[in-house]
A protein has these predicted regions:
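Amphipathic alpha-helical "stalk" segments
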Residues: 1-85
Length: 85
């Protein structure tokens, strides 16, 4: 989440190309090393990162509000993958 935190700290939009690129790298990392992670599932992980206080606390330690920023980037990336951007 460090790359995403850098973007958030620089006020780069979560729906911008740089944040979506980080989101896609994260999704591909999960898919390569853990389990199939289509964009729709990755979008759900973004929701989990915000809704579960344990995830949010862990992610937000990199930058305040980063869990919500990640959720927005993951959602934007999923929309792009579906052609809904």
């Amino acid at each position: 989440f460090r790359a995403l935190a850098t973007l958030a700290a620089a006020d780069q939009p979560a729906i911008g190309p740089a944040a979506m690129a980080v989101a896609e790298r994260h999704r591909q990392h999960i898919e390569q090393w853990f389990y199939a992670c289509p964009p729709s599932l990755h979008r759900g992980l973004g929701e989990l990162y915000v809704q579960d206080e344990r995830f949010a606390a862990n992610i937000d330690r990199y930058h305040p509000g980063l869990s919500a920023y990640a959720r927005e980037a993951w959602q934007a990336n999923a929309r792009r993958a579906a052609g809904d951007d």
